[in-house]
Amino acid sequence: MENIEKLLMQEKILMLELDLVRAKISLARANGSSQQGDLSLHRETPEKEEAVHSALATFTPSQVKAIPEQTAPGKESTNPLMANILPKDMNSVQTEIRPVKPSDFLRPHQGIPIPPKPEPSSSVAPLRDESGIQHPHTNYYVVYNGPHAGIYDDWGCTKAATNGVPGVAHKKFATITEARAAADAYTTSQQTDRLNFIPKGEAQLKPKSFAKALTSPPKQKAHWLMLGTKKPSSDPAPKEISFAPEITMDDFLYLYDLVRKFDGEGDDTMFTTDNEKISLFNFRKNANPQMVREAYAAGLIKTIYPSNNLQEIKYLPKKVKDAVKRFRTNCIKNTEKDIFLKIRSTIPVWTIQGLLHKPRQVIEIGVSKKVVPTESKAMESKIQIEDLTELAVKTGEQFIQSLLRLNDKKKIFVNMVEHDTLVYSKNIKDTVSEDQRAIETFQQRVISGNLLGFHCPAICHFIVKIVEKEGGSYKCHHCDKGKAIVEDASADSGPKDGPPPTRSIVEKEDVPTTSSKQVD
């Protein structure tokens, strides 16, 4: 019986296909166009599939019988307790064959009804291919030896345990089984303890400090001890470091002793320039920015050779740093060239109550050639607190000489001028009147007996000698009143006078009276 039903179904399908072909032929003859005939023949394949669906939809319930729901597990068979089909379930089906008209080809699907697709139930597996979906895969890493040997499931922890540590072996595995087998084989052959599995959240190590602690030599006691505040964890904005703590006398004595005893061993980012009374720092690329800032505040720097990103001077005063940046971008063609900062500075002066005078600087910026460091020698350091005033006078005299030498230079560009700092660079053109006035104003304000924050007869005597050598004159109303008159260098008692013990009796700075030849 089932074979007869299949044959009848095939017969109906073939009859529908035959009617479809005849309709196409009649349409082609009616239009007289061979192109439409070819087009319709070309679309024969999908129409066959639609005809099959149509044929399946025209079967009567007597021809197609659905298997009723089973009440017990086992082989599918008809349930004798349930009716095979009810009259209300019978669908009205067209039994007679309707001829196909040419107008049917203009209707959707050529007039052939398409049965609706059944909705898939939730119990049916999805039909789409899920082979392209990528599922997360965890790799496992075996660190065979070292202080943090074990099995890890995170590459970051593995890298922390191996990066920078010599002689540590590690390997990646796809599964924990392979990793455990390899780890056990290694520990068995080496006769060591079994390696533990260390999940990501339980790894107690830090990538930077771990490798650095193993490879770096032990720290020497306070060889490069930083003074002042601790180095910030991240580079602060300029507004956050504008109120830097004042340097104390103990800080200065420490830095003075450090630069005097430095012999060039253990640090290639700096070298020293040594004189009889004082030694100065020369900082090269990759120098410690905090060290540079503290030496700058102490007035103990001669030259800085910064990197292209100027990281070495990032803690210097903002106006000085901005002047250096403008020099790189506006004053030289090749911004990748190395530059230098040549500094002539005084040193701080203290009283009983604290800092009285901050250093004053004259800074020259220029393009640096190849740096040839001088040999650093360990010098004798026997400075005492009572010697600081004499040292301040000595650096003050050198500062005045450097400032007056600007009068001999005819091509200068002033990059920045402030109350206590002048930054300049060489220029290809003559010094303009605006820059010349800025230099003269700075000289008149700074060159006086109050250069160090208090009236110093030794400074006045030095200024008199310099000005008289140039044919000019210098007058100080303190000296004219008889407070302190120095007749010659041998009778110089300035350093012995020293700064006042308190700030309350410090007199204001004097504007010296000089002839025009002094600042020409």
Curated annotation (Swiss-Prot):
Residues 103-126, 487-520 are annotated as: Disordered. Its main location: host cell. GO terms for cellular component: host cell cytoplasm. Keywords: Host cytoplasm, Translation regulation. It is found in: Host cytoplasm. GO terms for biological process: regulation of translation. The inclusion bodies are the site of viral DNA synthesis, virion assembly and accumulation in the infected cell. Enhances the ribosomal termination-reinitiation event leading to the translation of major open reading frames on the polycistronic viral RNAs. Belongs to the caulimoviridae viroplasmin family. This is Transactivator/viroplasmin protein.
